[in-house]
Amino acid sequence: MIIKKPKGTYDLLFDEISQWQELEKKVKFFFENYNYLEIRTPIIEYNEIFNRTATHSDMVNKEIYNFYDKKGRLIALRPEGTAGVVRSYIENKLDFNENLNKFYYLGSFFRYERPQKGRYRQFHQIGVEVLGDNTPFLDLEVIATVSEMLIFLGLKDFKIIINTLGDESSYKKYIKVFNDYIKKQDIFLCSLCKERLKKNSLRILDCKTCAQKNFLKSVPLITDYLNDFSKQRFDSVIKGLKFMKINFQICPHLVRGLDYYNHTVFEIILNSDSIGKRNSLGGGGCYDRLVEILGGHKTSGIGFALGTERLISVLKKYDLLEYSNNNQIDVYFLFLDSKLFFKSLFLVNQLRNAGIKTEINYRFLPFLKQLKKALKYNPKYFVILGEKEDKNNEISIKNTINQNQKKLSQLEMIKFLKKELDL
């Protein structure tokens, strides 16, 4: 019986891998120009990290993959990137310095969700975390970063939707008003939102079922309960977005799915329905309390994450993702006698070490059969070694496009091919 891949996962092969590599290359180039440094954290973390940072979220309560290791420690496959980056930031004592730390990451994440178009149980994200300062100008920098990155990749038909959750005192004031209002409307709540009312009531604003009901359209807005500091901070972000000519829209009902956000929160939305019913590429926001929650010194942060699968789907739709033909090689090496295999492999390795993409057949075959295999790789050149060439320390090189063929010494082989291939 054939063993198949687990539900909600997929394999990447051939041209698709090339497209992913092209995207990753562009993203790394872009982030490094913005002075972000790559960070890589384990795909496993202690489950406690996510319990501390997102206690009431669906991610922790329903979707997390976790298991006990052989010593009884509860381990989780990471469901998101921020908690692991912050854990690393604290563990490596970066919260003691006064530097601004700007990180980017690309990697795999895991959630036990119902698989559907654009949503998988193993998925990938491109993310940014900036730790070490609390200023609206940093919010603006991070939002501008994601906006400019998408433009750099060729996307234009998107906008940033933005809101503020205020500081801690503004949030507490609002959440009391919000809960009092919702409790009076609880007969209209769906079953999921009735559970949310007990734990993380603000997530009711994010419910697609309840969003269509009139009672939620009349809910009090957090922007009416901000203190002066929170209001001025958000006003500065909005003023900056206008000055930077970033396409945005204030959305007073926008909340994020994790508990640790405060102040600015945002999502990146496609204006056209490019990826099915879900038109969000990702989102992010500020977190002033997260470092402290995980045991570090009080440090502010802000970040965002984009779904890589969704991003690739959109880029492919608009033909914005270039890829090379992985099957095409520079040289296919043909040897005409089984006694010449060792010499042939020696020359092949010389070509490869010189940066020339080369393949050879590892079992001796008659010339026409070797040629048939070679043509599947669509090589730019054939390099041919026969008894006569070997005796004279020569090699035959044939251009597969114009069919020109010439003999030259084996010592000249690499120099000639590098010139011809413009390497």
Curated annotation (Swiss-Prot):
It comes from the Bacteria. One of its GO terms (biological process) is histidyl-tRNA aminoacylation. Its EC number is 6.1.1.21. CDD domains: HisRS-like_core. It is found in: Cytoplasm. GO terms for molecular function: ATP binding; histidine-tRNA ligase activity. It is an enzyme of class 6 (ligase). Coiled coil: none annotated. Its main location: cytoplasm. InterPro entries: aa-tRNA-synth_II (IPR006195), aa-tRNA-synth_II/BPL/LPL (IPR045864), Anticodon-bd (IPR004154), Anticodon-bd_dom_sf (IPR036621), His-tRNA-ligase (IPR015807), HisRS-like_core (IPR041715), HisRS/HisZ (IPR004516). The keyword Nucleotide-binding applies. It holds the Pfam family HGTP_anticodon. Keywords: Aminoacyl-tRNA synthetase, ATP-binding, Cytoplasm, Ligase, Nucleotide-binding, Protein biosynthesis. GO terms for cellular component: cytoplasm. It catalyses: tRNA(His) + L-histidine + ATP = L-histidyl-tRNA(His) + AMP + diphosphate + H(+). Disulfide bonds: none annotated. Belongs to the class-II aminoacyl-tRNA synthetase family. Homodimer. NCBIfam families: hisS (TIGR00442). This is Histidine--tRNA ligase. The lineage of its organism: Bacteria, Bacillati, Mycoplasmatota, Mollicutes, Acholeplasmatales.
